[in-house]
Swiss-Prot record:
The gene is thiI. It is found in: Cytoplasm. PROSITE patterns: THUMP. It is an enzyme of class 2 (transferase). One of its GO terms (molecular function) is tRNA binding. The lineage of its organism: Bacteria, Bacillati, Bacillota, Bacilli, Bacillales. NCBIfam families: tRNA uracil 4-sulfurtransferase ThiI (TIGR00342). This is Probable tRNA sulfurtransferase. The keyword Cytoplasm applies.
């Protein structure tokens, strides 16, 4: 039988009440973006389900991409037939005959979305199961652990038959919860933070601080590749590359070495906040995990956060490094993150950074230098690259938007 349909089931979207249509529309838009290479696919959506009509496109390739789209609870490759008993029986038998081998077991499960259908769920299971048994050899029923599990979904307009459910990414559709900026360094942690931000329905724009000649073009490319990898979960992402060399050089000259890391983080946050405001985002995400390094103690976070009233969200705050690495491997960012190209924070790491910096002290040290012109210059000269799951990218400058 020609399995030319994919049934998509929603997760948390189903709890959204009156706003459900907005979430479904966003999910449909995201799926279309991720599947833009598959030009023959057609989309049908209702309040409770979405159906993709493949029109001959590669089903396995389409499903491989759907696994990463947030907002999908599960999905199934399906055969479609008319909603009448004889048509369902014929389609079910033909589908099972294509799949089974002698000695296999099977089970039939029916869901009646169309309650006016002539048989109820139990009657349908018995009718279809009996029809299959009478017309196959060496195939038996096992309702607990079958080799073949035939699921039948009866709707008024059509009936769909499936044999396997694929787990989706869960969460909420990217973009349904607003926009946030992700501070991305090129390390292991920040892409994972971006993943979790997107899972909760946020559209992200990434911000990376680039300090040539201290950091190389290969380090920049690593961040581009990481951001591109995240596009698999929700479509295009803007990456803002901030020129940070002058600012870091001034920090090295004017701020005591043990407080230079704190000053660097504070200035990065101020620049990210200005970009957030310019691009109409509402929060900033970081990959910080409490106590992991000197700049991620509670005292450091307090001193750094003091430069902004914008929410700074840290989804990895309670995770240890092993957990973060496992998630990075799962989402395929780990191998990119461990490429041996250092970012600007690594290059300028002091030998003995202050692990419990005082907010009053860093404010005192910074008061002798006017960093504002360099902050504004960095924002104005920020380069923006629009990354997508397709091969090409677009270079733009931040002031274009």
């Amino acid at each position: 039988m020609n399995e030319d349909y994919i049934l998509i089931r929603f997760g948390e979207i189903s709890t959204k009440g009156k706003n459900r249509k907005l979430f479904v529309d966003r999910l449909k838009r995201n799926i279309k973006m991720v599947l833009r290479d598959f030009r023959n696919v057609r989309y049908e959506s209702t309040r409770d389900r979405m159906t993709l009509v493949l029109n001959g496109e590669d089903a396995e390739a389409v499903m491989a991409r759907l696994k990463h789209v947030f907002g999908i609870q599960s999905f199934s490759l399906a055969v479609k037939c008319r909603t009448d008993l004889e048509s369902i029986k014929e389609t079910a038998l033909a589908s099972v005959q294509e799949q089974y081998k002698p000695g296999d077991t099977f089970k039939v499960s029916t869901k009646r979305a169309y309650k006016q259908f002539e048989l109820n769920t139990n009657e349908m299971n018995a009718e279809i199961g009996g029809h299959i048994l009478r017309n196959t050899d060496d195939l038996t029923v096992d309702v607990h652990s079958p080799d073949i599990h035939l699921r039948i979904e009866i709707r008024e307009d059509a009936t769909y038959l499936t044999f396997r459910d694929e787990k989706g990414a869960g969460g909420l559709p990217v973009g349904s919860g607003g926009k946030a900026m992700l501070m991305i360094s090129g390390g292991i942690d920040s892409p994972v933070a971006g993943f979790y931000a997107m899972k909760r329905g946020l559209e992200i724009e990434a911000v990376h601080f680039f300090s040539p000649p201290y950091t190389s073009e290969r380090a920049k490319q690593k961040v581009i590749d990481l951001t591109k990898r995240l596009t698999a979960f929700g479509g295009d992402i803007k990456l803002h590359i901030v020129p940070f060399t002058k600012t870091q050089e001034l920090i090295q000259k004017q701020i005591p070495e043990n407080y230079s890391m704190t000053a660097t983080r504070r200035l990065m946050l101020q620049i990210a906040d200005k970009l957030r405001e310019r691009h109409n985002a509402l929060a900033i995400f970081t990959g910080e995990s409490l106590g992991q390094v000197a700049s991620q103690t509670l005292e450091s976070m307090y001193a750094i956060n003091a430069v902004t009233s914008t929410p700074v969200l840290r989804p990895l705050i309670g995770m240890d490094k092993t957990e973060i690495i496992e998630k990075a491997k799962e989402i395929d960012t780990y191998d990119i993150s461990i490429r041996p190209y250092e970012d600007c924070c690594t290059i300028f790491t002091p030998s003995a950074p202050k692990t419990r910096p005082k907010k009053e002290k860093i404010e005192h040290f910074e008061s002798y230098t006017d960093f504002e012109p360099l902050i504004n210059e960095a924002v104005e000269n920020t380069e923006t690259i629009v990354l997508s799951s397709k091969a090409e990218t677009k270079d733009q400058f931040a002031d274009f938007f």
